[in-house]
């Protein structure tokens, strides 16, 4: 069995699970009447399917696992206790349902789906109250907590992509000018410590990486800096439009004057690399980013940040029970992303060691970048 742990006590887990559902429900309440399916998109899920998938995942891991499963039997294919929803595994198992098919699967109505979600969450909280001293239960409850909050962030990305009016507006930092940070050649521990509580399998475990001397921006590239690059021939982000002598950007359902000192977001890795190249610099590797993040002058932009690395396993990688979280994406086509989370990332995932990943052409995440260079 992999090293699985959660340091959250049962009552804290129950409160956090309830808070995550409240975040999801606040977005669900704001969907337009015809928005529960929406048009097909290769990077989005239909909301009705996605809500049900979140519930299915929680029920699968926290309520339906049978004791005595063989050690080499996959938890995603092993016999399970029955779901409270008919045909749940056929409808909502993302490991088995191709992305495009999620718009075609017959799904329960939104009211029935949300009622199932309430029933499952109440059962999970009751199980925590009875057996919260079980470390495996606490681990899987925390796994489901992070999974739900990740899907909440995916819904915010959908809100931006579709131009919907959100239930709240972002509070993004105004990034002041700052001198780049310089580091000499040294070794950095990349990854998470074994005694730090819940981590995902792709963060395991801390291991030394040698770095040559480098320089890295103290904070992400701003809209103003990117606009100057565009004025010299660079490609503007897709959600910008010319407005007089300047630019506007689309934030959800409205166009606003370009916030000059906010981090530039919704750029692909190719756009980030082109900006860095024009400046005579490059994107940082993940180890440089992680080392620099401990510096007192290192500023986060409340956005994800592209790195130069491909998403790849650490030495000795072993998949955790939810094997499809990382393993399928070690395919050479996904880029490693850092940033300690965006403005809609749950605070429990906002840690420098957290590894996110996207294919390099993606612009829909709340993602920006900073630049670096070798010394």
Task: Give names to the regions the model predicted.
Residues 188-190, 216, 264, 337-338, ...:
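Bulky hydrophobic/aromatic "packing anchor" residues in well-ordered structure
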Residues 14, 22, 34-94, 129-174, ...:
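Short, contiguous alpha-helical
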């Amino acid at each position: 069995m992999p090293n699985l742990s959660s340091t959250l006590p049962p009552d804290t887990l129950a409160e956090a699970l309830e808070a995550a559902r409240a975040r999801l429900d606040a977005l669900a309440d704001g969907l337009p009447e015809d928005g529960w399916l929406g048009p097909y998109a290769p990077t989005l899920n239909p909301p009705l399917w996605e809500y049900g998938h979140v519930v299915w995942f929680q029920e699968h891991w926290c309520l339906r696992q049978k004791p005595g499963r063989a050690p080499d039997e996959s938890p995603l294919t092993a016999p399970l206790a029955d779901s409270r929803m008919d045909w749940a595994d056929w409808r909502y198992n993302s490991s088995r349902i191709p992305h495009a098919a999620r718009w075609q699967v017959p799904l329960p109505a939104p009211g029935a789906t949300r009622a199932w979600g309430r029933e499952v969450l109440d059962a999970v909280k009751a199980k925590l109250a009875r057996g919260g001293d079980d470390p495996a239960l606490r681990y899987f409850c925390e796994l489901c907590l992070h999974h739900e909050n990740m899907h909440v962030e995916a819904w915010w990305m959908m809100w931006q992509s579709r131009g919907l009016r959100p239930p709240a507006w972002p509070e993004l930092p105004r990034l002041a000018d700052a001198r780049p940070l310089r580091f000499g050649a040294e070794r950095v521990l990349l990854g998470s410590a074994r005694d730090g509580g819940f981590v995902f399998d792709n963060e395991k475990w801390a291991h030394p990486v040698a770095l040559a001397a480098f320089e890295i921006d103290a904070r992400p590239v701003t809209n103003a800096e990117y606009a100057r690059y565009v004025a010299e021939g660079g490609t503007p982000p897709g959600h910008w439009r010319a407005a007089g002598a300047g630019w506007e950007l689309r934030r959800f359902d409205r166009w606003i004057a370009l916030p000059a000192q906010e981090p530039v977001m919704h750029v692909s890795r190719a756009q980030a690399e082109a900006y860095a190249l024009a400046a005579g610099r490059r994107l940082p590797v993940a180890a440089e980013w992680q080392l620099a993040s401990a510096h007192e002058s290192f500023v986060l932009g409340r956005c994800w940040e592209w790195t130069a690395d491909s998403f790849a396993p650490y030495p000795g990688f072993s998949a955790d029970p939810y094997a499809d979280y990382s393993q399928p994406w070690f395919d050479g086509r996904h880029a490693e992303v850092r940033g300690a989370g965006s403005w809609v990332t749950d605070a429990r995932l906002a840690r420098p060691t957290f590894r996110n990943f996207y294919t390099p052409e993606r612009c829909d995440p709340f993602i920006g970048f900073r630049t670096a260079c070798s010394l």
